């Protein structure tokens, strides 16, 4: 479902960090001239530009950015050189944030450097405490834009004062800047929060809790369509669907190790009589309980368990972002219990499942990452033999099946290495879509076993399998990719019937009923409004097909069809139309 970008917008733009870092100095130089009592914070280059933090005497309005830009351009035209200077005489008066950084670097014994913007006469226009990384002259700074204002706590600590952060971006060429500004506007149009609200897909309420999404009718239609495909594929690949409680006793997560490793992202326990119940952040411990509910034989393995699970994870309120970052989420989770000799076959089986799943949703894999541990003994379970065995097994599987991959040290789960399938979204973000995680640890912690052919008790291995991440994040990605214009089979707004006037409503309901009986997402707009208004609203709500019913259609027992995004209508009989949309649904168009 990777919708191609417009020919006019290039999301693969390049941002030069040295150019942007120098532009941040230019911004600070202009600010100091315009607001002499300002206090300077940091001004680094970032992924898509730069920012600089300031403490102003009075609040800064966005309208003032144009005035600041104007002075920046004037300074840039002076061909100021960026020169490393001796900072021994640097005046820290009214510069508490610079002084704090200076003292910190000095205490650590780190190199301290200063850079100045110097005019053609050798006069220092602006000097800053800085580690370097610049272009040699402001003559390179011709195409930049100050983009926005934001609040930012000093050093990222909410206990500190909130400074004013000015964001901007700088490019060498005019067309590069123009393209980037188009990217920003396109991102606004693709904001899943805006689209989701406008199309009635989801909502939030402070009364139901921050970060707890409410799925509306259209959102549930999308979610159920996705879920239907996932459930079918799970059955196809041999999974047994189970359902486990939303809570776990605190001792469960102590035993699993999750409380020790993920306590900051888990909700606090709820004391009920003599129990401490925690909203579950994952289902793997619950699935181990299911495995251990009965004696197991080697003949039963692999045992594949899947669940459409509701999870709860604590996110700070500032990190919550629409459906993308929430505190409760639905996840299609899978856990497979296997024998040692089944590792290769089962991991390959899961690779095939992931590839088939992503193909259905037309999602292209950007790259595969083999995530391994690093030397952090606190971050990862300390058992060298286990790790070496697990990591070499996954590497061998990828190599033998000629699957290209990159190695990412330190990105493994605390209990074992993993294979991550990375996807590039239409907004050029790389995200982990699917994962296969090999786990030698949890089965040991819970002392689960199976009876081997020789009658001995053996410990199974466990594979954690993720297909599409959470439904919340997946739908947010689909909204961004499609701008809400879903492919027909996934659309919550497949067909709407629009009678032109009252006298055609009976025939319109007849059409509606026949389409509804074929299990399509169909609506009827029988309001006493003009047909033009009905069509306009149907287009806004992205109905894939609008069926217009008037005198001619009623007399000829036909329908007039207008497709989303098109002006012309096509007349056909209802049976042919139903066959057409059945074909679209079945072929996943």
UniProtKB/Swiss-Prot annotation:
SMART domains: tRNA_SAD. GO terms for molecular function: ATP binding; metal ion binding; threonine-tRNA ligase activity; tRNA binding. Binds 1 zinc ion per subunit. CDD domains: ThrRS_anticodon, ThrRS_core. Its EC number is 6.1.1.3. The keyword Nuclease does not apply. Its main location: cytoplasm. Gene3D superfamilies: 3.30.54.20, Anticodon-binding domain, Bira Bifunctional Protein, Domain 2, Threonyl-trna Synthetase, Chain A, domain 2. It catalyses: tRNA(Thr) + L-threonine + ATP = L-threonyl-tRNA(Thr) + AMP + diphosphate + H(+). Its cofactor is Zn(2+). One of its GO terms (cellular component) is cytoplasm. Signal peptide: none annotated. Keywords: Aminoacyl-tRNA synthetase, ATP-binding, Cytoplasm, Ligase, Metal-binding, Nucleotide-binding, Protein biosynthesis, RNA-binding, tRNA-binding, Zinc. It is found in: Cytoplasm. GO terms for biological process: threonyl-tRNA aminoacylation. It holds the Pfam family tRNA-synt_2b. Residues 191-487 are annotated as: Catalytic. Zn(2+) binds at residues 284, 335, 464. Belongs to the class-II aminoacyl-tRNA synthetase family. Homodimer. Catalyzes the attachment of threonine to tRNA(Thr) in a two-step reaction: L-threonine is first activated by ATP to form Thr-AMP and then transferred to the acceptor end of tRNA(Thr). Also edits incorrectly charged L-seryl-tRNA(Thr). This is Threonine--tRNA ligase.
């Amino acid at each position: 479902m990777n919708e191609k970008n417009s020919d006019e917008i290039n999301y693969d733009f390049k941002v030069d960090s040295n150019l942007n870092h120098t532009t941040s100095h230019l911004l600070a130089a202009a600010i100091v001239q315009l607001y002499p009592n300002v206090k300077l914070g940091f001004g680094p280059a970032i992924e898509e530009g730069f920012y600089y933090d300031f403490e102003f005497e009075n609040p800064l309005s966005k309208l003032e950015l144009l005035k600041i830009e104007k002075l920046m351009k004037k300074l840039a035209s002076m061909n100021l050189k960026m020169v490393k200077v001796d900072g021994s005489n640097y005046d820290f008066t009214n510069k508490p944030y610079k002084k704090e950084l200076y003292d910190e670097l000095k205490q650590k014994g780190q190199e301290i450097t200063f850079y100045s913007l110097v005019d053609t006469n050798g006069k220092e226009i602006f000097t800053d405490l800085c580690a370097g990384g610049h272009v040699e002259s402001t003559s390179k700074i011709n195409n930049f834009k100050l983009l926005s204002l934001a609040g930012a706590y000093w050093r990222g600590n909410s206990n500190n004062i909130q400074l004013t952060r000015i964001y901007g971006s700088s490019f060498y060429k005019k067309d590069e800047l123009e393209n980037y500004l188009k990217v920003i506007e396109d991102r606004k149009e693709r904001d899943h929060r805006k689209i989701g609200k406008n199309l009635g897909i989801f909502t939030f309420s402070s009364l139901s809790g921050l970060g707890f999404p409410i799925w509306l009718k259209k959102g549930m239609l999308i979610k159920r369509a996705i879920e239907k495909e996932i459930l079918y594929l799970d059955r196809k690949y041999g999974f047994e669907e189970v359902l486990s409680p939303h809570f776990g006793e605190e001792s469960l997560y102590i035993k699993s190790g999750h409380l020790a490793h993920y306590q900051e992202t888990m909700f606090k326990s709820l004391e009920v009589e003599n129990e401490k119940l925690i909203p579950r952040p994952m289902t793997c411990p619950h699935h181990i309980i299911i495995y251990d509910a009965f004696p197991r034989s080697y003949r039963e393995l692999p045992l594949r368990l899947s669940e459409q699970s509701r999870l709860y994870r604590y996110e700070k309120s500032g990190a919550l972002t629409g459906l993308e970052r929430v505190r409760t989420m639905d996840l299609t989770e899978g856990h497979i219990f296997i024998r040692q000799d089944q590792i290769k076959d089962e991991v390959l089986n899961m690779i095939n499942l992931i590839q088939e799943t992503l193909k259905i949703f037309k999602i292209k894999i950007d790259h595969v990452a083999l995530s391994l541990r690093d030397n952090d003994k606190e971050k990862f379970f300390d058992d060298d033999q286990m790790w070496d065995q697990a990591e070499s097994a996954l590497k061998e599987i990828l190599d033998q099946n000629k699957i290209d991959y990159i190695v990412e040290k330190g990105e493994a789960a605390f209990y074992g290495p993993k294979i991550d399938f990375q996807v590039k979204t239409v907004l050029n973000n790389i995200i982990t879509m699917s994962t296969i995680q090999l786990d030698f640890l949890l089965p040991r912690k819970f002392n689960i076993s199976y009876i081997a052919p020789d009658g001995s008790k053996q410990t199974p291995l466990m594979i954690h399998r993720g297909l599409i991440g959470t439904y919340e994040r997946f739908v947010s990605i689909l909204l961004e990719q499609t701008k809400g214009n879903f492919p027909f089979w996934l659309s919550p707004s497949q067909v709407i019937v629009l009678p032109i006037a009252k006298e055609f409503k009976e025939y319109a309901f007849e059409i509606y009923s026949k389409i509804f009986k074929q299990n399509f997402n169909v609506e009827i707009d029988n309001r006493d409004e003009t047909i033009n208004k009905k069509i306009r609203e149907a287009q806004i709500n992205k109905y894939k097909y609008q069926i217009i019913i008037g005198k001619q259609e009623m007399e000829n027992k036909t329908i007039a069809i207008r497709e989303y995004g098109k002006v012309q209508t096509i007349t056909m009989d209802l049976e042919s139309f139903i066959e057409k949309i059945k074909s679209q649904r079945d072929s996943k168009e």
